Amino acid sequence: MTSPLAGMIAEHADIEKRLADPDIHNDPARARELTRRYAELATPVDLAQRLERVEGDLETAREFAEQDPSFRDEVVALEASQADLAARLRAYLVPVDPDDSRDAILEVKAGAGGEESALFAGDLLRMYLRYAERRGWRTQILDANPSDLGGYRDVSVAVKSRGTAAPGQGVFGRLRFEGGVHRVQRVPVTESAGRIHTSAAGVLVLPEAADVDIEVDPNDLRIDVFRSSGPGGQSVNTTDSAVRITHLPTGVVVSCQNEKSQLQNKESAMRILRARLLAAAREKAETAAAAARASQVRTVDRSEKVRTYNFPENRISDHRIGYKAHNLEAVLDGDLDAVIEALTEADLESRMAATP
């Protein structure tokens, strides 16, 4: 048994004992974290136990097959089962991002292309909301800056799973590869001559930070309030309900005006701020994380793209893995599993190849 696997089995047993202690529920946050980790370890521990049983059965079947050829078919079947279980278990032994099982904050920002880009940002928002609905996730618009024609200049959404997610199946684990610049090729509604235009929107996916992940000193914050504005900049509220929070040590600025209550806007802004500060702290500490985040959107430019949505050809193309499919309408309606699975599989294969 490999050392990492032995460690997983020991950790699983230890957590099981700790969760059986009634005192653990005096600390709900810690209990939730242990429950999440216990669920993460359940599958690899089960695979290891099944593999151990199959290997024992295989050894016995081989001994019998030496005396009785009728056992050879059983040997072949057990060898296939052994190979399958070993391959599935190995995937769990590859180092994974601990954030994969977290919830996420997703931001969509219009870029090059003016109003058409804002409309495309709205299409992307709807795509992710529909995908979340298909997955049974909960969503909450934290902040939105609508455009004149019903699109969005920028919008932030909290996406939360229901219950404990399996490894890699959490909101962030599923959406992490959506980060980057998305490009659209189509005839805009504002185009009278019927010419195809290219526009872009940027997507940023952040693991949502819990209070225990990062402490924010209130003295490090400057909080400004102002009146909410709608399309065209007109005021839509007679009270100062919108909130802008500036984290003075880093210069990170977050504003929220989507809710009618100043308190709700402040809470939403703090959620986004914590997520951004957590991501920034991990970037600084981990070179690998910095490289991964560098592939996400910095400036929304048409030249740096991860995916193209081509309306005339009904085609979606993910340029990172050469993925192509002619089901654009379905994808924009939230049918994202195929491309996400392809990206996840490519990432797993890359990490497995790099694992000794």
Swiss-Prot record:
InterPro entries: PCRF, Pep_chain_release_fac_I, Pep_chain_release_fac_I_sf, Prokaryotic/Mito_RF, RF-1. GO terms for cellular component: cytoplasm. It comes from the Bacteria. Pfam families: PCRF, RF-1. SMART domains: PCRF. Keywords: Cytoplasm, Methylation, Protein biosynthesis. One of its GO terms (molecular function) is translation release factor activity, codon specific. The modification N5-methylglutamine is found at Q234. It is found in: Cytoplasm. PROSITE patterns: RF_PROK_I (PS00745). Methylated by PrmC. Methylation increases the termination efficiency of RF1. PANTHER family: LD18447P. Belongs to the prokaryotic/mitochondrial release factor family. HAMAP family: Rel_fac_1. Peptide chain release factor 1 directs the termination of translation in response to the peptide chain termination codons UAG and UAA. This is Peptide chain release factor 1.
